[in-house]
A protein has these predicted regions:
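Catalytic-core signal marking the mid-to-C-terminal active-site face
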Residues: 167-260
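Phosphate-binding chemistry for phosphorylated carbohydrates and sugar-nucleotides
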Residues: 1-167, 180
Length: 260
């Protein structure tokens, strides 16, 4: 990454760049971004970029030290593409785990969106079938299909710099319109995740929460792909509301005897 930014004339600093074969993502990278936040603020930098071990993910830190997630990146570059007539089908591809606030922000900008299962392979599959140019995940897997069929962290960081320079705005201002909703996620270990998720009483509880939230939030209940877990997630205007509705659904799962 440093060689790319140096070649483009940026003043570049690098941290956590001394691998020894054992320290991959050790208090570093996109999964441990706190050190980068501190470094950006203490050194008065314009922006910071955090990559994961294989550099297919990228998260940003704005000049104030705030984390700019994959959802923010999709919003910022989706709007930029729309402004330049490059947003094919007027659609940004996301996954079901993108924050509710992202969809509210897209609605305000007149940008359409699609939701896929979690996983960048599902994002790209939808993009390829439907001719979409940008898609990704909250975690920072961002796909620009004009250039690649998978996430590329360095490409993502360059695209963010492109918008900052073109619009002459700091990262904080570019990310500001997207208001991230509070989220509560609870993992329930169960004996049979499919049966638990499809139980009529559980589905009725989920439906009741969805109706109560209306257009102020959302509930998502899904099974883990790798563990015997059912994940119950609610996003709403405040944390207490999230917790209340998550607890309601979790209690139904437990009352039906699925919880371990």
């Amino acid at each position: 990454a440093k060689s790319v930014f140096d070649a483009l004339g940026a003043d570049t600093y690098v941290i956590n760049n001394k691998p020894n074969g054992l320290n991959i993502n050790n208090n570093a990278g996109s999964t441990h971004i706190e050190g980068l936040q501190k470094f950006v603020v203490e050194n008065g930098l314009d922006v910071g970029f955090a990559f994961d071990g294989d550099a297919d993910r990228c998260l940003c830190v704005d000049e104030k030290g705030n984390v700019v997630t994959g959802d923010h990146i999709l919003y910022i570059y989706g709007c930029y593409m729309k402004e330049h007539g490059e947003l094919m089908n007027n659609t940004v591809v996301t996954t079901v785990m993108s924050n509710f606030g992202l969809y509210k922000a897209f609605d305000e900008q007149g940008i359409g969106y699609a939701k896929t299962a979690v996983g960048d392979k599902y994002v790209y599959e939808y993009m390829a079938k439907n001719g979409c140019r940008i898609g990704g995940e909250q975690s920072g897997h961002i796909i620009f299909s004009k250039y690649a069929s998978t996430g590329d962290g360095i490409l993502t960081s360059l695209k963010m710099m492109e918008v900052m320079l073109a619009k002459k705005l700091p990262m904080s201002k570019l990310a500001e319109p997207l208001k991230i909703y509070p989220q509560v996620l609870e993992n329930v270990r169960v004996t049979d995740k499919k049966a638990a998720q499809n139980d009529p009483a559980v589905q009725e509880a989920v439906k009741a929460v969805a109706e109560a939230l209306g257009d102020t939030g959302r509930i998502l209940v899904r099974e883990s792909g790798t563990e015997p877990l059912v994940r119950v997630m609610v996003e709403a205007p405040d944390h207490d509301t999230c917790q209340k509705y998550v607890s309601q659904v979790v209690e139904v799962i437990k009352s039906k005897g699925y919880a371990v």
